[in-house]
């Protein structure tokens, strides 16, 4: 029986490259030179942004987003927390999310059921397995999921006939 998996994954190496590109861009920007820094924590997949003022943090977030787009990483996976003061500096944390949580998985399954396609969707941990009798039905399910905007980027892998 044909099936595929709906997942949300990040290429960690590309994320690291994007953060390094953002650091280089920060050094090149005259208005931010020496006033801010990015600190990438690879294990937690977070970036700590430090600047003198909140408007500089906003500019740094925009630099990071542009670097992600250049590396073909969807910016929906970047979750920014509120800025906070730490001494004379402002700090903000940005976290890279991956994996489909239960709430999003339920939305995906509900969307597939609402589309009234001849497929079944089942939640399996951090992925959703979609099975059907025909390959065409699965391709319709992929098209239906791509047409709807979810708050996480979705990838389709493990397509089997």
UniProtKB/Swiss-Prot annotation:
UniProt keyword GTP-binding, yes or no: no
TM spans (from-to): none
Record Gene3D superfamilies: 3.30.70.860, YajQ-like, domain 2
Lineage top rank: taxon: Bacteria
Alphabetically ordered keywords of this record: Nucleotide-binding
Pfam families cross-referenced by the UniProt entry: DUF520 (PF04461)
GO cellular component, one term: cytosol
Disulfide bonds: none
GO function terms (MF aspect): nucleotide binding
Function of the protein: Nucleotide-binding protein.
HAMAP family: YajQ
Family: Belongs to the YajQ family.
Entry protein name: Nucleotide-binding protein PputW619_0959
Organism (species): Pseudomonas putida (strain W619)
């Amino acid at each position: 029986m044909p099936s595929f998996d709906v997942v949300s994954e990040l290429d960690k190496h590309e994320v690291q490259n994007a953060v390094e590109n953002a650091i280089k861009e920060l050094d090149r920007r005259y208005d931010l030179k020496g006033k801010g820094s990015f600190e990438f924590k690879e294990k937690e997949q977070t970036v700590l942004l430090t600047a003198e003022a909140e408007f500089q943090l906003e500019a740094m977030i925009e630099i990071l987003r542009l670097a992600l787009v250049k590396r073909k990483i969807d910016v929906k996976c970047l979750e920014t927390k509120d800025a906070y003061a730490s001494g004379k500096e402002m700090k903000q944390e940005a976290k890279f999310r991956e994996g489909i949580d239960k709430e999003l998985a339920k939305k995906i399954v509900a969307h597939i059921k609402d589309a009234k396609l001849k497929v079944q969707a089942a939640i399996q941990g951090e992925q959703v397995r979609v099975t059907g009798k025909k390959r065409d039905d699965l391709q319709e399910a992929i098209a239906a999921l791509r047409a709807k905007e979810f708050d996480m980027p979705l990838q389709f892998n493990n397509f089997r006939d």
